[in-house]
Regions:
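C-terminal alpha-helical cap/extension of soluble enzyme domains
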Residues: 2, 10, 108-112, 150-153, ...
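N-terminal amphipathic alpha-helix/helix-capping segment at the start of soluble metabolic enzymes
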Residues: 2-33, 88, 92-96
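Hydrophobic faces of well-ordered beta-strands that scaffold small-molecule active sites
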Residues: 28-32, 51-53, 101-107, 162-164, ...
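Catalytic cores of alpha/beta
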Residues: 35-45, 113-133, 200-212, 236-240, ...
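Active-site-adjacent beta->alpha loops and helix N-cap segments on the catalytic face
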Residues: 37-38, 57-79, 119, 168-184, ...
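A structural motif
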Residues: 48, 135-136, 156-159, 187, ...
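Alpha-helix-loop-beta-strand connector modules within alpha/beta enzyme cores
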Residues: 63-111, 175-192, 231-252, 286-301
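Glycine/small-residue-rich loop that forms an oxyanion/phosphate-binding "nest" at active or ligand-binding sites
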Residues: 65-83, 91-175
């Protein structure tokens, strides 16, 4: 697949270099999975570190609209700015206040399998490019203003990234497509989603993803739940490649055991309101997010 042109750089707008201390949390990271703008707002307000934003979560998620993404960036930025304002004039010296909110956008053109044809691959690449362009356009609205004029070196309010996944017919990573998606992200963090759990050989797939520049791997250890796949997750963590994010029926009550049994430093979970049907919007339960945040903050980081 040949592409013309180059991707706009997110690095200079959402990731400052060298990476300062606030980029490395001293606690287990909690990432929520949400379907709407309010879910992003709730996650940021309740203290989650990141949110993955996708549409149609009952179908395992698809790419949200560009309008939804823009509004979600603003919603997250507003919550971060409120937190920083509450921390006072020297918020930049306080890690919890300074930390940007991570927003990860799901790139998936349809439900069903993770094997994509050339047209679907082009659509995914175009989505990443368009979202990257949007991030550039919005950068001035989501980055703190420098005092006295000039370019600011303060951390941005929102750390934007992408969640992707593509396989071949034989159950291996579609290296060509994933490489193009990572290249188009051009420095923004890229997560490989739970298509990973459908790979025929997770160890081989994990090595492939490291070579492709993927920073995070979302996985249940190729099991129905993260708890059931704990041994596989632990093995991946021990191998020291991309950051492993444990996912799959993760609940607040099981977070301590999951972290202790796997050594993961990052977890991913949905926090839906009770009683929702598949035909209803998958709203986020703020109380559940807060409970999960309190739990992970109390869990000692694995050695």
């Amino acid at each position: 697949m040949r592409l013309t042109g180059s991707a706009p750089s997110l690095r200079q707008h959402t990731i400052t270099a060298p990476v300062p201390a606030w980029r490395h949390p001293d606690h287990v990271v909690l990432e929520t999975c949400v379907e709407d703008i309010e879910g992003v707002r709730i996650s940021a307000r309740a203290g989650a570190d990141r949110a993955e934003l996708g549409d149609n979560l009952t179908a395992a998620g698809t790419t949200p609209s560009i309008g939804t993404i823009e509004a979600a960036i603003f919603a997250a930025a507003e919550q971060v700015e409120q937190r920083r304002a509450q921390a006072g004039a020297h918020w930049a010296d306080k890690p919890e206040a300074a930390a940007p909110f991570g927003l990860r956008i799901l790139i998936r053109p349809r439900g069903g399998s993770f094997v994509y044809d050339a047209d679907e691959g082009r659509a995914m690449i175009a989505d990443v490019r368009r979202i990257a362009t949007l991030a550039l356009e919005m950068a001035e609205f989501t980055r703190p203003q420098a005092t006295g004029g000039g370019r600011t070196t303060l951390p941005p309010a929102v750390d934007l990234g992408f969640v992707v996944g593509a396989l071949t017919e034989d159950g291996t990573i579609d290296r060509g497509l994933v490489r193009l998606l990572v290249d188009m992200a051009n420095g923004a963090p890229v997560t490989f989603h739970r298509a990973f759990d459908q790979c025929r050989d997770t160890v081989e797939a994990y090595g492939d993803l490291e070579g492709l520049g993927v920073r995070y791997v979302l996985t249940s250890g190729a099991a129905q739940t993260a708890a059931d796949g704990a041994s596989v997750i632990a093995g991946l963590v021990a191998s020291g490649g991309p950051t492993v994010v444990a996912a799959g029926a993760v609940r607040p009550d099981g977070l301590v055991d999951l972290v202790e049994s796997t050594g993961v430093r990052e977890v991913h979970m949905r926090c839906p309101r009770e009683g929702l049907t598949p035909n209803e919007p998958q709203r986020t339960d703020e109380a559940l997010v807060r409970r999960a945040v309190e739990t992970v903050r109390a869990v000692p980081l694995p050695e």
